[in-house]
Amino acid sequence: MTQTVPQALQDFSLRYQQAWQDKHNELPRSEELADLVSPCVEEKRDGAVLWKAFPREEMADFTNVENAIELTLHEDIKLFFGSQYSADMDATWQGNELTLLQVWSDDDFTRLQENILGHLVTQRRLKLKPTVFIAATDAELDVISICNLTGNVILERLGSDKRDVLAETLTEFLSKLEAAV
């Protein structure tokens, strides 16, 4: 049976949590998110929060972004950002480091939507095919995105048409990610 995006994301989140626990003997920890409310927070300790990914009861709604840009987002984009709350998670893809971007809270989701809209407006202005970022890399202008037309996961150079396909599907990409803690 084919794995869904929410299942693949949950599986990676559990692999990340387990890798963190194996290394640090506690749930994943964040100092940066210590003062922000989230359903992910399990415990506050020493100026940090211990957290774990938390499934959303209802899928997040991207209608406002789609209406504003007059574009239907690829279903995998909506499933990726709309199925759980989590802190960002460090990972490697074929030995290359990245940070998988996630939604910490409803306030964070609002900011994400604004960033997605700004990204899509810029792409439209530059006459580029629409993509939505899902991970940051060490290279300032390189991001990992989902192509809105094909659903391919790509390495994209911001502001240019330079794109390399990393995986045919998001589930394939998530299943091959390795947690980096």
From Swiss-Prot:
Transmembrane segments: none
Membrane topology, from the record: Peripheral membrane protein
Keyword Secreted: no
Pfam families: Syd
UniProt keyword terms in alphabetical order: Cell inner membrane, Cell membrane, Membrane
Keyword Membrane: yes
InterPro entries reported for this sequence: Syd (IPR009948), Syd_sf (IPR038228)
Source organism superkingdom: Bacteria
Subcellular location: Cell inner membrane
Purpose of the protein: Interacts with the SecY protein in vivo. May bind preferentially to an uncomplexed state of SecY, thus functioning either as a chelating agent for excess SecY in the cell or as a regulatory factor that negatively controls the translocase function.
Family: Belongs to the Syd family.
Annotated protein name in UniProt: Protein Syd
Source organism of this protein record: Vibrio campbellii (strain ATCC BAA-1116)
Gene this chain is encoded by: syd
